[in-house]
């Protein structure tokens, strides 16, 4: 199988998206007869060429971080390029696009934040006349690059397993997808304790560390655009 993966993170090769994709492609490539190419959508001048490559692949996966309950602008721009590359022929066969799947990762622990864009992506596949493979949703990804290896072991194993299954079936394994998505929403009890702990500043410690590293901690409440 010739697979094209489009990394839609503005951070490119240094992104959390790239790290997850590495383990997915490791699993995918372990299956004989498969080849994979990763294109980086941050290279916006290459969008037209990547769109043409997509039409020549046997399967396409677009992976990106969730931005404001949607997608980065470079991903939307690439989607427009895919539409522009669609043949003008009226025959259904000539307009067909390879099977299309998506991976959406975010820092939010709850899967619900990615459900709106998931519905859009399913509709997008139909509009491109592609078989919709599905959308893998994974929350709680922020900070994985600074975690000890043992904390990421299960996550990376799951993505390798997902890649191996895809390499054989050209499908996302539904059980693995469900495990990766995790909880849909925090329980009422969890939300209650979060409200109790929020005033302590416990949840701000990671951000405070970054602010201090950049000499911006004392200005964290500035409002430069307020009249």
Model feature map: region roles:
Residues 10-12, 68, 107-110, 142:
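Short histidine/acidic/glycine/proline-rich micro-motifs that form metal-
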């Amino acid at each position: 199988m010739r697979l094209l993966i489009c990394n839609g993170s503005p951070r490119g090769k240094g992104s959390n998206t790239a790290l997850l994709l590495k383990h997915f492609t490791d699993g995918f490539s372990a299956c004989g007869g498969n080849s994979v190419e990763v294109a980086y959508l941050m290279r916006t001048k290459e969008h037209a060429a990547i769109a043409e490559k997509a039409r020549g692949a046997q399967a396409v996966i677009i992976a990106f971080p969730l931005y404001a309950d949607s997608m980065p602008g470079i991903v939307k721009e690439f989607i427009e390029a895919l539409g522009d590359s669609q043949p003008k022929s009226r025959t259904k066969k000539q307009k067909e696009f390879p099977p299309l799947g998506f991976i959406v990762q975010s820092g939010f622990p709850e899967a619900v934040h990615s459900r709106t864009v998931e519905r859009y992506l399913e509709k997008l596949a139909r509009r491109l006349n592609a078989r919709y493979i599905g959308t893998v949703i994974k929350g709680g990804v922020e900070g994985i690059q600074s975690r000890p290896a043992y904390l990421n072991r299960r996550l990376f194993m799951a993505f390798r397993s997902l890649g191996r299954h895809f390499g054989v079936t050209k499908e996302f394994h539904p059980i693995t997808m469900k495990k990766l998505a995790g909880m849909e929403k925090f329980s009422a009890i969890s939300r209650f304790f979060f409200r109790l702990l929020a005033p302590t500043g416990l949840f701000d410690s990671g951000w405070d560390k970054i602010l201090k590293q950049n000499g911006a901690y004392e200005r964290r409440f500035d409002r430069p655009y307020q009249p």
